[in-house]
């Protein structure tokens, strides 16, 4: 990125133990004009600090909670304020973060699913319609080079006429009980309350 011509964004979650956080940071880098300037990256200030040190982020823009981060951004004006916050956390956190972001007037880029249940989804839709704060869900799959190649092959007719297709997302790594072996990525996925 040349000079300081970039759009400032914040990140909530996505710290050291986050699988999707790395994917989001890589995608942000590829865009070229976005820069993470602060956020709340872990369950403690120390975990967040350990994470941001190698990234060269300003410790003043590190917050112990997403609420503190979003409320601080609400008070900032113009170029000091982030353009949006990217939230990469377990599913049960999507709703409270989105609601807080909208209360603070901060656009949010979230992950799937929007919420954990239909009531939360309805509340979220009402909140967004009332506040008009943009809320978007990340769809990173179109950025994969494999999909671009598949699209090219289809367009060129290289594989003939498509009559039917089936797509699935496998999580083979969860076929074994990896949550019993300390895998934090698996813990929240197998807990019905989370």
Q: What residue ranges belong to the model's regions?
A:
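Beta-loop-alpha module in the N-terminal Rossmann-like domain of NAD(P)-dependent dehydrogenases
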Residues: 61-127
């Amino acid at each position: 990125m040349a000079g300081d011509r970039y759009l400032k964004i914040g990140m909530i979650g996505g710290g050291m133990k986050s699988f999707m956080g790395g994917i989001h940071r890589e995608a942000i880098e590829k865009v070229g004009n976005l820069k993470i300037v602060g956020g709340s990256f872990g369950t403690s200030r120390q975990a967040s600090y350990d994470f941001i040190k190698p990234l060269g982020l300003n410790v003043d823009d590190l917050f112990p909670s997403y609420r503190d981060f979003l409320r601080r951004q609400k008070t900032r004006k113009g170029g000091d304020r982030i353009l949006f916050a990217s939230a990469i956390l377990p599913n049960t956190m999507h709703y409270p973060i989105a609601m807080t972001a909208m209360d603070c007037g901060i656009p949010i880029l979230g992950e799937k699913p929007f919420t954990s249940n239909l009531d939360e989804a309805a509340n979220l839709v009402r909140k967004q319609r009332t506040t008009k704060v943009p809320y978007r869900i990340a769809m990173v799959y179109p950025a994969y080079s494999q999909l671009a190649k598949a699209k090219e092959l289809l367009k060129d007719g290289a594989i003939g006429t498509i009559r039917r297709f089936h797509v699935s997302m496998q999580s083979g790594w969860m076929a074994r009980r990896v949550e019993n072996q300390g895998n934090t990525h698996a813990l929240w996925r197998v807990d019905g309350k989370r």
